């Protein structure tokens, strides 16, 4: 994929927060697949799909201090999340060989 599309696809999927991890990883295609799967799972949990402000560039997949994956949101998306009463989110990402999947649970008050 990297050879075919260069960095163009990576720049569409990844935010500036995620870019350093992509440059460091030994498995860039799997890194992208995991990030895309997580963002898609979030968009589906929100019930919007990828529609502004729920876009690839407004969602960053980050690693919490504990090592657990989580999200960081663009301010406009954060506003939408809070307006829906969502107080916590949970993310799990799994990969096996060339497959990636993610599950997102959103908790509201």
Describe the role of every protein-language-model region.
Residues 1-109:
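Core catalytic alpha/beta fold that binds nucleotide/phospho-ligands
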